[in-house]
Amino acid sequence: MTSLNPVFKIGMQISEMILAHESISKEEARLRSIEMLRAVGIPDPEKRMNDFPHQFSGGMRQRVMIAIALACNPSLLIADEPTTALDVTIQAQILELMIDLKQKRQDAAILIITHNLAVVAETCQRVIVMYGGKIQEIAPVKELFNNPLHPYTQGLLNSIPRPGREQHRERLRAIPGNVPSIMNLPVGCKFCTRCPVKIDICDTVEPPLVEITPGHSARCHLVKPVYEFSAGVNTNE
């Protein structure tokens, strides 16, 4: 929402993007801008076209950014931390808006980049977990939350407060250590310096991304043997 230029009117910023990508007249771009503001729930869009960003609340500016992103009808909307700096109520409204717009555009998809696992659980169908610039786990959202395979994913989920945890006096478990510098990553597994189940090979050999079950992949030397053992398969054969 800080991407809006504070010295230009909202309508000009939406129209400019449309004119940069499509061969249409300024009037057509203006009319589409009004329609996009209406689509994202901005009241009285014809009037608000002439307002400046400082005249909008944080949530309304986020809606304007979504309108700009969707104005040329893209097949993929990339939303990078779409709820950052918004209060919980406005976060819910923005997520509901994005889901609603996605449902109305059956041929479109939304890629959400976020650290907020509540946002992931609420909006996503499929999840890619990344650490150190590498994909560590891929799974359908329910599968990921119910059966996380990678130690990093498990650490993320264990650090989330849950209802009823206080009754069992269960402490939150933070991931130990610090995130390594992207300029000096470990040679082997990128998570090995913080992993509670690390073995020797993790320091020197980066594990491949392996499909463990249909649609569920993980990058860990221990995951496949552990899963096979838990499934009743003799890994020594």
Locations of the language-model features?
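Conserved ABC ATPase signature
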Residues: 51-56, 60
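Conserved ABC ATPase "signature" region
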Residues: 28-47, 100, 154-157
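A short, proline-enriched helix->beta-strand linker immediately N-terminal to the Walker B motif
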Residues: 71-75
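Charged, flexible cofactor/metal-binding loops and thiol motifs
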Residues: 140-237
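Hydrophobic anchor residue at the start of the ABC signature
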Residues: 14, 66, 90, 94
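P-loop NTP-binding/switch modules centered on Walker-like glycine-rich loops
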Residues: 78-82, 86-170
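ABC-type ATPase nucleotide-binding domains, specifically the catalytic core motifs of the NBD
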Residues: 2-4, 12-28, 38-42, 55, ...
